Amino acid sequence: MAGQTVIVSGLNPAAILQSTIGGAPVAAAAENGHTRKVVPLSKDALQDFMVSIITQKLQDDKQPFYVLDLGEVVSLMEQWNSALPNIRPFYAVKCNPEPSFLSMLSAMGSNFDCASRAEIEYVLSHGISPDRIVFANPCKPESDIIFAEKIGVNLTTYDSEDEVYKIRKHHPKCELLLRIKPMTDGNARCPMGPKYGALPEEIEPLLRTAQAARLTVSGVSFHIGSGDADSNAYLGAIAAAKQVFETAAQLGMPKMTVLDIGGGFTSGHQFTTAAPAVKSALETHFHDFPELTIIAEPGRFFAETAFTLATTIIGKRVRGELKEYWINDGLYGSMNCVLYDHATVTATPLACMSNRNNLNCGGSKTFPSTVFGPTCDALDTVLRDYQLPELQVNDWLIFPNMGAYTKAAGSNFNGFNTSAIVTHLAYAYPN
């Protein structure tokens, strides 16, 4: 099946497409009336697929590109449903809003966490209904609240009295989730606690404020922070959430029915340790809430490993043993994750021009290397003292695990347009 092009399309961007490959569903939505091509591959053929894309490029078209492995997305959803079957994912759109990726997640049952009017409009444009959206931003512009009321997004978060007043004025039928601050951020790469979440002493006053405003507080939300967080952080946060449920009951408020455990999940070892801890904590603290709806806001769990970035070497300089390379994406583009998401990127050579018989330069001597991005800012340095074989201009560097907070947060600085980077679709089967 490898190399065969399968064209799939749907009536709208959220349609579950009926094409199958080897019995496995392939979902990729029609975008703005255009079909997308999905290439089925064996798991170890992704590199060959990338080489085929590079080979088909014109001599003057060496722009970076992504490959989205839809097979990886299916695998991750299967892992989620197996490990946390009673927790409904609301994918964090901010992490990566690539259209076919969102359509795939939607087709597999994911709902969506949006933080702005623009994100809500984007999700709705894919045919996804507003009742599948949580407006998970505790501090929203009044204009966004008015928009949410107009189109029927009726679940949001809050952690301040002023937010209650805005919602009471503009969207009184909206159900609220009280965002609380976890006791620990679990050593997350991107902690959320300094900015969001009610402190313990603020919880009862905030519940009373919502009660006085005649708003419905349906439950509690928290976020332990993004990226590699210690799974034990979920334990304390879930226990604290239960205390909020009890406080609301003591105040005579309607019984809470929703618990939002936020994000912070990373695929791999962190998830395999976090999922049992979450299940255990929920059983301990919420076993007497059989009708409880539990949701989560995973972003990088689904996005990070599903995307691979290919970049061209556009410049080279040799200083003794040190090899310096310039590539056509960098810290002002996809690699902004190095600065803002505290990510560590890795690179694999693809010597399409200089060594076609040994694309990965296996067995070749390696040298300490620096990889710069394309802009004129010296800060735009992707890798330092990184071991690479000697490469040439027009060779390529491949960056795996580039789906989380990459293209979505890139800029157009110096005229390098991150948003213009094309994404190719593949469906890789496990070996």
Swiss-Prot record:
Residues bearing PTM N6-(pyridoxal phosphate)lysine: K94
GO cellular component: cytoplasm
Gene3D superfamilies, A to Z: Alanine racemase, Lyase, Ornithine Decarboxylase, Chain A, domain 1
EC number: 4.1.1.17
Coiled-coil residue spans: none
UniProt activity-regulation remark: Inhibited by antizyme (AZ) in response to polyamine levels. AZ inhibits the assembly of the functional homodimer by binding to ODC monomers and targeting them for ubiquitin-independent proteolytic destruction by the 26S proteasome.
Site features described as Stacks against the aromatic ring of pyridoxal phosphate and stabilizes reaction intermediates, chain residue numbers: H223
Active site, per annotation: C376
Name of this chain's protein: Ornithine decarboxylase
High-level lineage: Eukaryota, Viridiplantae, Streptophyta, Embryophyta, Tracheophyta
